[in-house]
UniProtKB/Swiss-Prot annotation:
Pfam families: DUF150_C, RimP_N. InterPro entries: Ribosome_maturation_RimP (IPR003728), RimP_C (IPR028998), RimP_N (IPR028989), RimP_N_sf (IPR035956). The keyword Cytoplasm applies. The keyword Cytoplasm applies. The gene is rimP. This is Ribosome maturation factor RimP. It is found in: Cytoplasm. GO terms for cellular component: cytosol. GO terms for biological process: ribosomal small subunit assembly; translation.
Amino acid sequence: MAFPTAEELTALIAPVVATRHLDVEGLRVTKAGPKSTVAIKLDSDSRPDLDLLEVVSQEIGELFDAAEARGELSFGAGYLLEVSTPGVDMPLTQPRHWRRNRTRLVSLDVDGKKRIARIGALNAEETAVILIERNKKALSVTVLELANSPRAVVEIEFAKPAQDELDLAGRTFDEAVEETDH
């Protein structure tokens, strides 16, 4: 039996991560004999802490061991299991990524130009998100359709965000859209 693929392992761990209300954001298999690695990136709306990641890592390890004992998987000479969160450099590609990063700054690559905006609310259908930008002293609100979203990554912010930006990011999608109409 061959070393399991990322797709096979993702399907196998799906029930375990679902019971913990986690999403698999990535699973990478690196085959290197006894130094093979299975790296799993998990996230959730409530930001998993280290204690939860430790519990889930234990559960996944036991699941892999049991499947290997039954002959359903073969890791060969062994493997290292890494379970972590994706980190801030993960591109925002799904509506849940935008929802989880509400009020944070995001860097967007629009027509080859870098654009920085604060993430506001998603609409009810989770197909569009509010972006808040500061132009000198004034704030502007734009609606970004996620289907046409450029590459976007969360920006690390060292200074405390301006309160007016946070207030606007905290409004509902419809309230923020109304703000642009005035």
